[in-house]
Amino acid sequence: MSNPKIASQQELVIEAGRTEQQYWKDIWRYRELFYFLAWRDIVVRYKQTAIGVAWALIRPFLTMVVFTVVFGQLAKLPSQGAPYPILVFSAMLPWQFFSNSLSECSNSLIGNANLISKVYFPRLIVPTSAVVVSFVDFLISGMILLGLMAWYNFVPTFRILTLPLFIGIAFAASMGAGLWLASLNVKYRDFRYIVPFLVQFGLYISPVGFSSSVVPEKWRLLYSLNPIVGVIDGFRWAILGGESKLYLPGFLLSLGFVVLLFVSGIWYFRKVERTFADVI
């Protein structure tokens, strides 16, 4: 005969799938939650702004203008045979996607603390939805690039067909770095102050306003340890065509670092995921 006192103390614990296969099946089962979180974040971002989605166009456009004046007009840096605004904006697209993803991912778990602490679902859905929201901004900003191409009568070469490959690499870099920051920010809230600094510093050391070809040859391989360098160079190679060249050793190094970042990001996130509800 069961003891009522013992029965009253029993708890029901719902855990994530113990096997990797079950975990990814859980993500598919909860796909509607993923759609909801992504759509909610898109709506909230622009709902109470005066000009709405136009903010996704204004910020990269103004940054492009500043970089064009400083590096193209004043510093007279080479443009790889393309109009300087197109050179800059072909790098602004992946950089903005990457930097926005870091900012959104790092705070995504904290911002959904009530949901995470009360309901079981694969936590990977939360930062992934944040990256998808940043990708929507990326697609919107792409209209500026199309406008610049039309303005300068710039016609891309067949290389443009390889652009989806580099978009995939940018997505992997954003996810990998975002998962690390999202996981660390749950336990160490200092990262809410560190991430904006990392994003600002990353803009200065990445070839957004200039071509990476201006970096001295002896430093280019070391410079390519920055994973976003290979992504930006790939975007420019695909979009600009013509004189633009892809520094293959540096690109492969950046690609390897992106793969490492992506795989290790998923591994670490899965490792600490079960503690999120306790410490958040």
What are these regions (language model features)?
Residues 1-280:
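Hydrophobic transmembrane alpha-helices and immediately adjacent juxtamembrane helices
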